[in-house]
Amino acid sequence: MPFNICITNAIFKMNNKKFLHKKLLLLTLLALFISQVGIAQKVVRYDLYVKDTIVNYAGKEKRAIAVNGQIPMPTLEFTEGDTAEIVLHNQLKESTSLHWHGLFLPNKEDGVPFLTQMPIEPGETFTYRFPIIQTGTHWYHSHSGLQEQIGMYGSFIMHKKADDKTFRKGIDDLPEIPIMLSEWTNLRPENVHRMLHNASDWFAIQKGATQSYAEAIRTGNFKTKLKNEWKRMMAMDVSDVYYDKVLMNGNHLTDLKSIDGKSLKAGDKVRLRISNGGASSYFWLRYAGGKMTVVASDGNDVEPVDVDRLIIAVSETYDVVVTIPENGKAYEFMATTEDR
């Protein structure tokens, strides 16, 4: 009996000693983990003030929505490992929200009213907070009503860490320009929505894709036009809407001579982070200075490939690298709608 007791005590002491060592090891590892997380998770905060504004893009003053006084919305930039803290201040007379297109994040931060959150009502402030766990070019926009169509869209860029194993020298360290493509119509977005719902051919007539009733009568095609409309065979086009203006970073034309104060010279390479924030237009992209090198698509790195032109669909993003060929000359980067 004493023998058994001695053995039992010896085992207990040994197990207790192992337990203390394991506990100490776990506490040490936990402390290291917490310290690393604290270093890695830098909080990057943006305050976004959403407010009505008046613009004149196409000859008439029209209502639009500006964020921090600008269209498109400010470009939001982060580095993988950061924590994004985006505070939206709603100064509109209607509710609003923000959706992060293509981002991996907690569902409650996704920005869809009545699904992942309640609408942000007039006068309210709402904070989106989520970890940045990916890299690449993406964009963000309102997910309330038709606010995106009148200005609530912007670039969302997530950079790689310098020690990232996928970091590509000569690509990921180049000077960058975010480019947001969009369209503008002087029609209220609610009217555009109604005309599309009613299958109106007014936009097709404006673009010359179909004949008006007067033209159909004059050319002897009135019967055919009526027959097609009776069959609901409306004139088709690549884009359903006629737009008064195409915008690049909120302007029809931009003259760029430097990036972050540094003048561009022959041989310099520039990375263009391009997002199509348009409502319905595909854009053909061309560069007068030579070929473009595609290096990423929808936020994902791709094997670099040279192209003469590139088409970008609604909501897509592309990263392309262009080279400045000569000094003292302007080289046009042009976006043309496919239904031109």
Label every model-predicted segment.
Residues 36-40:
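Sec/Tat signal peptide C-region and signal peptidase I cleavage site
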Residues 1-22:
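N-terminal secretory signal peptides that target proteins for export/translocation
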Residues 41-314, 321:
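Histidine-centered copper-binding motifs that mark active-site loops
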